[in-house]
Amino acid sequence: MLFCIFAKSSHTPANCPARQQKHTFMIIKRILSTAFAIAATVVSLAGVPPVSHPKIGTTAQSDDGAITITLVAKKQNYGGSADTRDADINSPKSINIHPDGSKYYVNSLEGCTTISYDFKTNRKLAVIHHQFREGRDDALWSQPSGLYPWRHYHNNVNTFAGKPVESTFSHNGRYLWVPYYRRSFDINAQDPSAVAVIDTRSDKVVRLMETGPLPKMVSTSPDGKTVAISHWGNNTVGLIDISSGKPEEWHHKMVLTVDRQLDLNYPLNRSVDRDNGSGYALRGTVFTPDNRYLIVGCMGGGGGIAVIDIQQQKYLGRVLGMMSNVRHLVISNGYLYLSINGGGVVQRMPLKDFMAVARTMDGTTRKTATARNWENCNVGKGARTISISPDGRYIFAACNNVSQVYVVDTKTMKAVCHIGVDSYPVGLDISSDGRYVFVTSQGRSNHGGNAVNIYEVTYKNPPSARFCPACGAPRTDEMKKCPECGLQYEGMTVMNGNITPDKTPDGTQDAKNTAIKPIYYAGGALAAVLAGVFFFVRSRRRK
């Protein structure tokens, strides 16, 4: 390329200094433009780690042999064989195993679908399309609450396709709540979105309710009376009363603001980056076991964890002191666990210690407090969803940047093994017996993704112990309440870190340190080009 650029200069008349100087300048400009274009392209690729596609049968084991994890099945929308290929897996964002272990649900963000599968056979049971039309689907909608005003769009707002993000079960697993990242026409997610409620008996949408802009995380309270939805888009959290068993009687309770609500006024004809720069970027959301508080991770802004007093219907403030970029929250065995996306870390603190700090805030005169003495465990960069074995012994973390699932021993807070997963993992869930872990790989920048990996987990000592989710005291089936803290057990169980009402019964590529290499190559290429410019100019001056 450079040879061709230099060659074009040979026809410049030698007896015209002005033209020669101008021509030299144009050549240098062309060289520099080309160099920077090459460098920019290479650097942009540096943000996309290498793609990984582990083969079925891939296995990892802890050094002491206490836990072994094996990739046993896949659902993938690329290559593969007839029994693994699935065209409905389109940017799978999250996965949720039904509390009774009969089926599991995958949210395909870009496919605008939720797919249900038989847990034992992996047979597809239904494809639930999130596409709605005003007039035809009016009966699905709850009454407008007045809490979510429309500011930019006003016509046919109930005709859209919804992009499903996360999910939570309610009413003993009868219903699955699925918020939409945005309505398809709202290109910058600045007006109300919606949440769909799927009846898991029929696998059909039976209710639609409005939400704030860009909802991501959704959680059900331990007593099964409230659903909380955190709005990434504008620093707010919505609460829905679901105390009735009838969907038509569910209604919005209130919207609470974390410090300040963002004023959204983006173009209607040009997309902007809403994944970044969205205030606190509210993400991980979980109720405390006593139903009293809702805690919400702040992935952006000033970071921390927002605390809402459900009883007083009041935002208290943000607890600080943990690492920045909090992504997912789980409460298990008396501990609050966090995944730290950027740092690739799992942190924890006794829940009682965290709440002692949180209760020092009042939402007015004191809106921040610092919690210290966190325990840390390094896992892979890009730690996204975390889930915990039923006995609380092991944490499983989907690590996006390195395309790995990490396993952490909670006794030592050390990573004991990790295993490859299709790039780039985001969602994760574990079966109620701890024997299977399901991971969704969404992909990034049109690389990797479009896969669900299914792992079988074997333990030297299978999970059996159960603990109080509030204080960590041992728990048995006969206990109706915790003898230590008095938490009522009746009507609740702990599954995957979310406390929900009881339900009756192709080769792996190492991604380590490889993402930085294109930057070195880009720098080297740019240096070489600049050196070429220097010697070219020097030779022209000699002439």
Description of each model-found segment:
Residues P463-G497:
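Cys/His-rich metal-coordination motifs, chiefly Zn-binding "fingers/knuckles"
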Residues A35-S44:
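Bacterial N-terminal signal peptides
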Residues G47-A465, G491-M492, N496:
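Predominantly soluble domains enriched in secretory-pathway, periplasmic, or organellar proteins
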Residues T24-A35:
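Bacterial N-terminal signal peptides that target proteins for export
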Residues G491-P518:
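Short, aromatic-rich amphipathic segments at membrane interfaces
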